[in-house]
Design a protein with these regions (language model features):
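Loop/turn elements at helix/coil->beta-strand transitions in domains of secreted/extracellular proteins
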Residues: 10-14, 30, 70-73, 117, ...
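FAD-binding subdomain of flavoenzyme oxidoreductases
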Residues: 75-145
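General beta-strand structural signal in soluble alpha/beta enzymes
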Residues: 15-19, 34-36, 45, 54, ...
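Glycine-/small-residue-rich beta-strand-loop submotif within the FAD-binding core of flavoenzymes
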Residues: 28-59, 65, 93-101
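Short active-site loop/helix that positions an aromatic residue
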Residues: 4, 62-69
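Glycine-rich N-terminal segment of FAD-binding domains in flavoprotein oxidoreductases
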Residues: 1-41
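Extracellular/periplasmic catalytic domains that process cell-envelope and extracellular macromolecules
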Residues: 8-10, 25-28, 45-46, 67-68, ...
Length: 145
């Protein structure tokens, strides 16, 4: 994946990513498209800390079906066909009022910025200012002050 990002950066060809089944921007003329749905489908559950790790191609329906085995749930919204974009854009669901947005459930995220640099962001456990920065990143900025 990293090589694909570097190639598009050097050639100035626009780059699109697809990870679910509902985006209107999964393909376009004269664009590179990286479809994560086929090769990034892993889901794992850590019984010790009750955290789930998912790869970028997992749909919310697949996640929900997986979590049933552990008597767990995730606020996936009204469609099981959405992918990682659902979470990264906030993720409003019927459970949002009581459980928060989907993005509020994220403990850490790893990926690549548009320029090809890797990143790893984790929910802070220390200072109040770090927690406010994390909440702002997760979409709560308009409620913070």
């Amino acid at each position: 994946m990293f090589q694909s990002l570097k190639l598009t950066h050097n050639s100035s060809i626009p780059f699109l990513i697809s990870s679910g089944g509902t985006t209107s921007r999964a393909a376009a003329d004269n664009h590179w498209v990286l479809d994560l749905r086929k090769n990034y489908q892993n889901i794992s559950y850590d019984l010790n800390n009750t955290c789930v790790e998912i790869e970028a191609g997992v749909t919310m329906g697949d996640l929900s079906n997986f979590l049933v085995n552990y008597k767990r749930s995730f606020p996936i919204g009204l469609s099981g066909k959405t992918g990682m974009g659902y979470i990264l854009t906030g993720g409003i669901s019927p459970l949002s009022r009581s459980r928060g947005l989907a993005i509020d459930q994220i403990m850490e995220i790893r990926g690549f910025w548009g320029n090809g640099e890797q990143f790893h962001l984790a929910k802070p456990k220390e200072s109040k200012s770090s927690i406010l920065e994390w909440k702002g990143l997760c979409g709560a900025a308009i409620f913070l002050g």
